[in-house]
Amino acid sequence: MATTKLVYILLILFTFTVSPAISTAPEHCDSGFDNPCINKAKALPLKIVAIVAILTTSLIGVTSPLFSRYISFLRPDGNGFMIVKCFSSGIILGTGFMHVLPDSFEMLSSKCLSDNPWHKFPFAGFVAMMSGLVTLAIDSITTSLYTGKNSVGPVPDEEYGIDQEKAIHMVGHNHSHGHGVVLATKDDGQLLRYQVIAMVLEVGILFHSVVIGLSLGATNDSCTIKGLIIALCFHHLFEGIGLGGCILQADFTNVKKFLMAFFFTGTTPCGIFLGIALSSIYRDNSPTALITIGLLNACSAGMLIYMALVDLLATEFMGSMLQGSIKLQIKCFTAALLGCAVMSVVAVWA
């Protein structure tokens, strides 16, 4: 997974360094210079406020689940934690459908792009679809590699007296018999799934966090920034809760927990700093910006939608905890709907 994350980061850095002359903007493209809200002097202090506010709310969001072990209502094995996790999963699903994917469609269908090929093919939907499939492949192959790396194949029940359905067999060293077999319960397999889910989810979130930060930092529209600050704070708070819950269940080492929380917390502010540095040469209606950010948004949307539906919501709703209680299912479904509703309301401003 570290290699996969590195590939994604390199891809992002590469796309932002592509030559600004990918294509030429049509003559009828609105430059936006007549907008009275365009004021660089007023926009800069607002961007600084945005950096501090988003940094703070992101930190609160992603770290709050990590301290839930000390709150009886929110312990990982309790109903309260499950309800909060489903709410956060709804937030992530709403982010993909109501924020990232619509932005991608809007950018890649802009009148600032040439008709051929951007208006003749739904690139946003196609890239989101392929991103979801690639995420599925990464999810599946990574799990297989990690599981297969430690598997030695089936062992007869009569030899070990253990139900194979409840154990996977891992190579170990037995001091009494030379090379022996160590058996791990299903909990180990579930822990591996949680770790894969947390890491893939973080990659998807980092994708669109970079885009959000760059766009906010590069714009000089003070009216837009004012509305975005509050909306993005709510967005990062709840998204952080969702990611933090996944990190908690993955039971990473403290160092890995810190690094994942650090990257989530700092990515958007770093994107804003980068946008500020590029604001003098960056035009959000240029073909290069529209194509690059539009494609990155589509890719991020596919990943977030897949993770929310398949690895988060479906996994929990098909699990033994929710399957054993219709009442808890209803509560969790309501929480997921509420999460989607919150992001739908936030979409009015962001």
Curated annotation (Swiss-Prot):
UniProt topology in membrane: Multi-pass membrane protein
Keywords (A to Z) from UniProt = Cell membrane, Ion transport, Iron, Iron transport, Membrane, Signal, Transmembrane, Transmembrane helix, Transport
Q: Could you list the residue ranges that cross the membrane?
A: 48-68, 81-101, 121-141, 196-216, 228-248, 258-278, 290-310, 330-350
Q: In which tissues is it expressed?
A: Expressed in the external cell layers of the root subapical zone.
Q: Which residues form the signal peptide?
A: 1-21
By its UniProt entry, which PANTHER family does this protein fall under?
FE(2+) TRANSPORT PROTEIN 2 (PTHR11040:SF145), ZINC/IRON TRANSPORTER (PTHR11040)
Kindly report every residue range on the membrane side named Cytoplasmic. 69-80, 142-195, 249-257, 311-329
Stored Pfam families: Zip
Regions of this protein lying in the Extracellular compartment: 22-47, 102-120, 217-227, 279-289
Domain of life of the organism in this record? Eukaryota
State the family it belongs to.
Belongs to the ZIP transporter (TC 2.A.5) family.
One MF term in the entry's GO annotations: zinc ion transmembrane transporter activity
One Gene Ontology cellular component:
plasma membrane
Q: What induces it?
A: In roots by iron starvation.
Q: What does this protein do?
A: High-affinity iron transporter that mediates under iron-deficiency the iron uptake from the rhizosphere across the plasma membrane in the root epidermal layer. Could also be capable of transporting zinc ions.
Kindly provide the name given to this protein in its UniProt entry.
Answer: Fe(2+) transport protein 2
| Subcellular compartments | Cell membrane
Origin species = Arabidopsis thaliana
**Tell me, what is an example of a GO biological process annotation in this record?**
iron ion transport
